[in-house]
Amino acid sequence: MSRLWIFDFDGTLVDSEPGIKKCYVKITEKLAPSRVGFAENILIGPTLLETANLILSNQNEELISEFVELFIQEYDQKILLETKPYKYATEALGYLTNKNDEVIIATNKRGAPTRKLINFLGWNPFFNWIGCMDEFKNYKNKSDLIKNEIKNKNKYEKIYFVGDTVNDGKTANENNIPFIFAKFGYGKKQDWSKISIIKTISSLKEIIDNY
């Protein structure tokens, strides 16, 4: 029996924070200058729409659609391909594939930039499936995505979820999937007290060394 590996994307396989924050700050400076400080410290992980709501706050709700549109233009066309994979990401994905494990993505990142970046990195052969929240309008969160799209869990010897935020841990816990915390990502300062973690890793090389 093979194993199933579910990976988050931003903050787990790729370090997208510099580019994404650069875009958030640039657009916030244009639309809502008083919120720049908030944008500079925003957690990378929630969907674009959720983040736009957080940055703009209730006082600027009428700007949300414009914010999202400007972000997509700036990020997808100018910034996306500057994103770097984490060290050992390619090696870890290749290692799991060579062991005949199934590897999938479950991410809040939009589908278009996710697939464009995966193609640019040459990672398409590694993934059996790529799940991006904006492509599944009927699901309210990543936990719903996993629950409804991953069928026949009993066919796998083991299932693991690797992610870097509390939302990832919650998703794994709600679906009774062992969670591996990638502490090199963006969720280090979050409150992890209610999340069950089977292993914490400081590098993706630990996937190769321990699994």
Model-identified regions with their sequence ranges:
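Glycine-rich phosphate-binding loop signature in dinucleotide/nucleotide-binding domains
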Residues: N98-D101, N152-K158, Y211
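Short, acidic loop-to-helix structural element flanking the phosphoryl-transfer center
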Residues: Q77-I105, A112-R115, K140-S143
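N-terminal helical cap/lid subdomain that shapes the substrate entry/recognition surface
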Residues: S2-E91
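Acidic, Mg2+-coordinating phosphoryl-transfer loop and its flanking beta/alpha structural elements
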Residues: F161-K199
